[in-house]
């Protein structure tokens, strides 16, 4: 079935503009007719940041920006899904066209700019699924014109605290001017301090401690990774997601669209994001949860992320090229890998190749 989608379904969707195709796929999931889940395998269940995930594969933020189809995504076989990025006020993002396919590279360049319907719309939709099972995280961001961007992140924590199973603080999108500056040590210290203070205050009121993850860029120098690791450890952050899209265009084959401005995702991001993942694992040690994102499009690439240091993995662009059967295909492949490797749980495979990946050189 996956092969059938790649030849027929993808051809049909790719006849549309990339953003139109995205809207059509959301509409398709809303029908409830697309269900391709894999059976639960206890060997894939992992406990991360106090949450029990049925399997380590998640849907990355960016697809379900406005919390329209979280449960439909879980039915595809994902162990968790992440909505957003959500900003306090609605914003339209950057002018169209702003999503570009690089088919030969199985990649996408986007410069969306946090287009979303805002807190109110997402809150209303998530409230309708309150009490349902399934781990749904909320990825929070800042409005482009915010005078105090950190206040926007704090507002996200407070608004969605009862509904989110975890939060992701997104300071690594390259499409909001100046946003990545929040990754600098002094700015990051203030950001994490205020966000975690809000989390702790909300947690005391309802006796629930929601994990907070930080999503970082793959274009950071080793010294910048040092600073992020130190600050995350010092402030007892719950985990780090590695990584967002890259500004690098190293090794691309596609002639069409390669020079478009924006962040690159998909297969070409795999090596870079995995190297940064491994380097961060070496810096934070064995206890801090890390989530690997970037170029995951098969059980093999998901397993490679885990062996490089990831507790969980996420994908998005792979779904564009491989179709809705991909999550179940990966989950089945990970089950087979656990048996093949002779371990009782997927977590036992983490860090097996961390040193090797951390030593690799990043392409310019």
UniProtKB/Swiss-Prot annotation:
Active site: 173 (nucleophile)
Pathway noted in the entry: Pyrimidine metabolism; UMP biosynthesis via de novo pathway; orotate from (S)-dihydroorotate (quinone route): step 1/1
EC numbers, comma separated: 1.3.5.2
Xref: SUPFAM superfamilies: FMN-linked oxidoreductases
CDD domains: DHOD_2_like
Swiss-Prot/TrEMBL cofactor(s): FMN
Substrates-to-products reaction catalysed: (S)-dihydroorotate + a quinone = orotate + a quinol
Residues the entry annotates as binding FMN: 61-65, 85, 139, 170, 215, 243, 266, 295, 316-317
Topology in membrane: Peripheral membrane protein
Keywords, sorted A to Z: Cell membrane, Flavoprotein, FMN, Membrane, Oxidoreductase, Pyrimidine biosynthesis
Cofactor note as given: Binds 1 FMN per subunit.
GO biological process, one term: 'de novo' UMP biosynthetic process
Residues given in the record as substrate binding sites: 65, 110-114, 170, 175, 244-245
GO (cellular component) term, any one: cytoplasm
GO molecular function, one term: dihydroorotate dehydrogenase (quinone) activity
Subcellular location: Cell membrane
Principal subcellular localization: membrane
InterPro entries linked to this entry: Aldolase_TIM, DHO_dehydrogenase, Dihydroorotate_DH_2, Dihydroorotate_DH_cat, Dihydroorotate_DH_CS
Description of how the protein assembles with itself and partners: Monomer.
Function: Catalyzes the conversion of dihydroorotate to orotate with quinone as electron acceptor.
Family statement drawn from the similarity comment of this UniProt entry: Belongs to the dihydroorotate dehydrogenase family. Type 2 subfamily.
Protein name: Dihydroorotate dehydrogenase (quinone)
């Amino acid at each position: 079935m996956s092969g059938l989608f790649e030849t027929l379904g993808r051809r049909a969707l790719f006849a549309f503009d990339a953003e139109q195709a995205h809207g059509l796929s959301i509409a398709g999931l809303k029908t409830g007719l697309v269900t391709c889940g894999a059976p639960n395998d206890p060997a894939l269940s992992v406990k991360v940041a106090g949450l029990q995930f049925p399997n380590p594969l998640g849907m990355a933020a960016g697809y379900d920006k406005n919390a329209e189809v979280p449960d439909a995504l879980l039915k595809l076989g994902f162990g968790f899904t992440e909505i957003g990025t959500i900003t306090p006020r609605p914003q339209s993002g950057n002018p169209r066209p702003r999503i570009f396919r690089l088919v030969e590279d199985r990649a996408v360049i986007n410069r969306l700019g946090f287009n979303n319907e805002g807190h109110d719309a997402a809150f209303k939709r998530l409230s309708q699924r309150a009490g349902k099972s399934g781990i749904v995280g909320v990825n929070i961001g800042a409005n482009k014109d915010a005078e105090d961007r950190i206040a926007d992140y704090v507002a996200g924590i407070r608004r969605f605290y009862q509904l989110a199973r975890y939060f992701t603080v997104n300071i690594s999108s390259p499409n909001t001017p100046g946003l990545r500056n929040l990754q600098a040590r002094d700015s990051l210290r203030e950001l994490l301090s205020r966000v975690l203070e809000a989390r702790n205050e909300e947690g005391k009121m309802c006796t629930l401690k929601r994990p907070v993850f930080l999503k970082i860029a793959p274009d950071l120098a080793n010294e910048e990774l040092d600073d992020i690791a130190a600050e995350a450890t010092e402030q007892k952050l719950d985990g780090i997601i590695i990584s967002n899209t890259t500004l690098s265009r190293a090794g691309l084959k596609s002639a069409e669209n390669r020079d478009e401005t924006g962040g690159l995702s998909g297969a070409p991001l795999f090596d870079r994001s995995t190297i940064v993942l491994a380097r961060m694992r070496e810096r934070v040690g064995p206890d801090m949860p890390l989530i690997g994102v970037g170029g995951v499009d098969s059980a093999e690439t998901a397993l490679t992320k885990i062996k490089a240091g990831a507790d969980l993995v996420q994908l998005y662009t792979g779904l564009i090229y491989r179709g809705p059967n991909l999550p179940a295909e990966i989950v089945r492949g990970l089950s087979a890998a656990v048996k093949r490797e002779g371990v009782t749980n997927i977590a036992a495979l983490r860090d097996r190749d961390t040193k090797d990946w951390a030593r690799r050189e990043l392409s310019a």
